Amino acid sequence: MLAGRAARTCALLALCLLGSGAQDFGPTRFICTSVPVDADMCAASVAAGGAEELRSNVLQLRETVLQQKETILSQKETIRELTTKLGRCESQSTLDSGPGEARSGGGRKQPGSGKNTMGDLSRTPAAETLSQLGQTLQSLKTRLENLEQYSRLNSSSQTNSLKDLLQSKIDDLERQVLSRVNTLEEGKGGPKNDTEERAKIESALTSLHQRISELEKGQKDNRPGDKFQLTFPLRTNYMYAKVKKSLPEMYAFTVCMWLKSSAAPGVGTPFSYAVPGQANELVLIEWGNNPMEILINDKVAKLPFVINDGKWHHICVTWTTRDGVWEAYQDGTQGGNGENLAPYHPIKPQGVLVLGQEQDTLGGGFDATQAFVGELAHFNIWDRKLTPGEVYNLATCSSKALSGNVIAWAESQIEIFGGATKWTFEACRQIN
């Protein structure tokens, strides 16, 4: 009798289980359990199933908590390691960033811009530090060559003697840098020796930089206002020059300049003119592997210029609003022309004219990847289309060469920022 009752109990329990789920979970399995005779067998089975589910959930939560504890411990260990490394880096940065350093290209970085500066100096590896010192030496040598050119033009024996003294100092510094590079390659020298050697070299560089700056200041006081060039030695988002004057409304223009660059890929942006509501009102740019382009009201024409060979080149672009006709000249010869470039759109007035950077906003929003790297001089703008003969006179430094009637190249009208420099330059005397 008891066996029959147990069989009926299992059968009823199976029916309850089958009736409580609508999904098919595969082959049916029967579970027998002891329950009182007068108990509700279906309710008992459901309660048992709920208890099993709760037990399973508790086990899963326990496993999750254990895994999270392990993760937290691992992350704490990682944080300790990173904190230690950061402390070492900060200590090394403090040693490397002494007050007597002479660094080319400035060291300033615009906060919050989110742009790549690409010109900040490395603060950790000794080899990269020596590379930066080498760049500084090269920059000082170039400035010295300009002083030498100036002394030849003015036949000053005092300037010549100073030039010889500075050249001797530069030669000594080059020997010190070369010796330090050889020591690094042989694996000699510890961190203390590195710091001491670098301090000596940078102290000499600082002294040399100050002396050349003094000579250049005296040179600037004596040179004509248009006999200068701008130099942008590094691709950064903070090195640029600004023209104090703005442009009037123009229905035609000619823009000409001397350029020298060996930057690759792309020489960057020699100049950009932005107005409220249009950052690309007038832009000359070559970036990436694209050819040089002229933008007017954000409309583009590709130009046939090839100028990144490290030599001086004279370039001009003319444009008229009627049919958007344009012409491009390199070294006095027309190399390309076209039409339908922003036709019937006059150049808007009251904008900001920047040399060396492309503007994403009015007067700012610079991007290092589009910055100009090289040298620029005799930037002039006219409010008309120059003739081929007039362009040729400019490229050959003829006595008949004209100055821009809208923007004329004058040192007093150019402000420099972020480490850009002004050096003496005379077109056709220093060409290549």
From Swiss-Prot:
Q: Which gene encodes it?
A: Nptx1
PANTHER family from the UniProt entry: NEURONAL PENTRAXIN-1 (PTHR19277:SF24), PENTRAXIN (PTHR19277)
Return the SMART domains for the record. PTX
The record lists the organism as: Mus musculus
Q: List the disulfide bonds.
A: C256-C316
Q: Which terms in the Gene Ontology molecular function aspect does this entry carry?
A: metal ion binding
Name this protein carries in UniProt: Neuronal pentraxin-1
* Protein task: May be involved in mediating uptake of synaptic material during synapse remodeling or in mediating the synaptic clustering of AMPA glutamate receptors at a subset of excitatory synapses.
Manner of cofactor binding, per the entry note: Binds 2 calcium ions per subunit.
Please give the Gene3D superfamilies that the UniProt record associates with this protein.
2.60.120.200
Chain residues that bind Ca(2+) 2: E358, D360, Q370
| Primary location class | secreted
Keywords on this record?
A: Calcium, Cytoplasmic vesicle, Disulfide bond, Endoplasmic reticulum, Glycoprotein, Metal-binding, Secreted, Signal
Annotated Gene Ontology cellular component terms: endoplasmic reticulum; glutamatergic synapse; synaptic cleft; transport vesicle
This protein's cofactor list reads: Ca(2+)
Q: Which residues form the Pentraxin (PTX) domain?
A: 226-428
Quote the subunit structure annotation.
Homooligomer or heterooligomer (probably pentamer) with neuronal pentraxin receptor (NPTXR).
Tissues where this protein is expressed: Expressed in brain and kidney.
Signal sequence coordinates:
1-22
Which annotated residues bind Ca(2+) 1? N280, E358, Q359, D360
Q: Which residues are glycosylated?
A: N154, N193
Q: Where can this protein be found?
A: Secreted; Cytoplasmic vesicle, Secretory vesicle; Endoplasmic reticulum
The annotated region (Disordered) lies at 88-122
Source organism, top-level taxon = Eukaryota
Name its GO BP terms in alphabetical order: axonogenesis involved in innervation; cellular response to glucose stimulus; cellular response to potassium ion; mitochondrial fragmentation involved in apoptotic process; mitochondrial transport; neurotransmitter receptor localization to postsynaptic specialization membrane; postsynaptic density assembly
